[in-house]
């Protein structure tokens, strides 16, 4: 399935806040080393958990989305279920990301 980039505020609203199913959002930056390091693991998760929509938001391109979500460190992962944020993970922590995925599937 893969991790799909979100390119606009309207697209973020449509695909994340208006979503009815589980969603994972990776807030990242192109210059962020840990973001690049965790990207393959996130791709793998997206292929394993096909019932979850995986998106990524470049904080430099969509700074207003990052700010409105309280993102202050990269990478930050938000886990949504039914349009509500359930979990947040700051940093490239594979175990915590797995736990966030599990939480939105329950």
From Swiss-Prot:
Keyword hit for Disulfide bond: yes
Active site: 32 (nucleophile), 35 (nucleophile)
Keyword field contains Electron transport: yes
This protein's UniProt keywords: Disulfide bond, Electron transport, Redox-active center, Transport
Site (Deprotonates C-terminal active site Cys): 26
Segment forming the signal sequence: none
Record site: Contributes to redox potential value: 33-34
Domain of life from the UniProt record: Eukaryota
Disulphide-bonded residues: 32-35
UniProt xrefs under Pfam families: Thioredoxin
Residues covered by the Thioredoxin domain: 2-106
GO molecular function, one term: protein-disulfide reductase activity
Summary of the function given for this chain in its UniProt record: Component of the thioredoxin-thioredoxin reductase system. Participates in various redox reactions through the reversible oxidation of its active center dithiol to a disulfide and catalyzes dithiol-disulfide exchange reactions.
Family as reported in the entry's similarity comment: Belongs to the thioredoxin family.
Name of the protein in question: Thioredoxin
Organism encoding this protein: Penicillium chrysogenum
Organism taxonomic ancestry: Eukaryota, Fungi, Dikarya, Ascomycota, Pezizomycotina
């Amino acid at each position: 399935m893969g991790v799909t980039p979100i390119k606009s505020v309207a697209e973020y609203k449509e695909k994340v806040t208006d979503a009815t199913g589980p969603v994972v959002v990776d807030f990242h930056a192109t210059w962020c080393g840990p973001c690049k390091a965790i990207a393959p693991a996130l791709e793998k998760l997206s292929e394993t958990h096909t019932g979850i929509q995986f998106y990524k938001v470049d904080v430099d391109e969509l700074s207003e989305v990052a700010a409105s979500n309280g993102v202050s460190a990269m990478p930050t992962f938000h886990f949504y279920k039914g349009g509500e944020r359930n979990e947040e993970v700051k940093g490239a922590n594979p175990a915590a990301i797995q736990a966030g995925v599990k939480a939105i599937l329950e």
